[in-house]
Structure formats: structure tokens, C-alpha cells
Design a protein with these regions (language model features):
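Short, contiguous clusters of charged residues that form electrostatic/catalytic patches at enzyme active sites
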Residues: 48, 52, 74, 120-127, ...
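Phosphate-binding/catalytic loops
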Residues: 125-187
Length: 187
């Protein structure tokens, strides 16, 4: 795989394609569902909690991988290598009422989950990865399911009540996106 400015990227995994399986049915595209957050910061943990809620229901699906991470930007882009679609679940602060669930396209992704000023936002990271030759989902196959946070500063392992109440709704939205996000070639 090409590298840029001394950054080595992991080789891409060959993903599932829209090719007939042995049974003649189209194979679903490989999808990453990844929750972002800090498990020790109140509402910042909501992305992790949503994917933890989803993991048992998605465990039997060979076309979906469920993951957790604490970083956005370049690290998130690297986690997407080899996938055809991605759903990122995270907290967001836009001023909407706490617990509001937003669905954003990749060009609107504000995520900058980085403790370093040396990282970039996800759209920039995706552009970098594609330029370096990484197999990444196209923008139209990436969504952010973002839960409006009330408190992203307090150390606590519990979300605020409004955000905790939004977890099942966010999980349902992720499940719906798995069925409707472009590229689903299931029979």
C-alpha cells in the first residue's frame, strides 16, 4: 500500500462484493459499525453504549463488524480500511436538545475526536487515505449517527438521563441504516 509523508497504512482487506455466492444470491457488502467515545466521560460514552447495545443482535452477521474506539480522524479512517460501508456512532454538541439523534453524511462529519492538534477531521482523513490508495467506503456509504450530548466534561460512567434514553432510538436508526444505506445487495 502506498504511504505518504512517512505514514505507513495497513494493507486493505479484500471486502465482500456484489457478486453472487455459491447459492446464486448476492453477498451483502462488508459494513463497519463503530462507536466512538470515552467510557469515563458522561455523555461522550454514548457511541460506545449504542454499539454495545447492538453487538448481540449483530453478532451472527458475517457482513457486519461492530467495533469501539476512542479516536476519530486518521485512526478512524484506518479502521474503515477494507469496508464497503461504515456507520459511525458518536456524541455531538450542536445546541439541539440533549438526546436528539442526528444522521449525518460523511461530508458533514464534524468528528475531531483527538487529543492531539496533529490529527485531522474525518473528511480530511478519508481524502488522505483514498489518495494513498486505501480501500475505503465511498462518501455516500458513510453515515454518522450522532446523539446530542448534554455533558461531555464530567467524569462518570453513566450518561445523562436524556442521552441514556436516546440509546435505544440510536440503535434502531443504526439497524435501519444497515438495511437502507446504499450498497446493500442482500436478496
Amino acid at each position: 500500500m502506498k504511504a505518504h509523508a512517512g505514514v505507513e497504512m495497513q494493507a486493505s482487506v479484500e471486502p465482500h462484493r456484489n457478486e453472487p455466492s455459491a447459492s446464486g444470491h448476492a453477498v451483502r457488502l462488508k459494513t463497519l459499525v463503530i462507536g466512538l467515545g470515552n467510557p469515563l466521560v458522561r455523555d461522550d460514552s454514548v457511541g460506545l453504549r449504542v454499539v454495545q447495545c447492538l453487538a448481540p443482535a449483530l453478532a451472527g452477521r458475517e457482513d457486519v463488524d461492530v467495533a469501539e474506539d476512542y479516536w476519530g480522524g486518521l485512526r478512524l479512517m484506518e479502521r474503515m480500511i477494507g469496508y464497503d460501508r461504515a456507520i459511525v456512532v458518536d456524541a455531538i454538541c450542536t445546541g439541539a436538545p440533549p438526546g436528539t439523534v442526528h444522521v449525518l453524511s460523511s461530508d458533514a462529519l464534524p468528528t475531531q475526536r483527538s487529543a492531539s492538534a496533529h490529527d485531522v477531521n474525518l473528511p480530511t482523513a478519508l481524502a488522505f487515505g483514498r489518495q494513498a490508495g486505501a480501500h475505503l467506503p465511498p462518501d455516500e456509504r458513510i453515515r454518522l449517527v450522532a446523539v446530542e450530548a448534554a455533558d461531555v466534561l464530567t467524569f462518570s460512567e453513566e450518561c445523562t438521563p436524556a442521552v441514556a434514553a436516546a440509546i435505544p432510538r440510536a440503535a434502531r436508526i443504526v439497524t435501519e441504516l444497515l438495511q437502507t444505506l446504499p450498497g446493500d445487495a442482500s436478496p
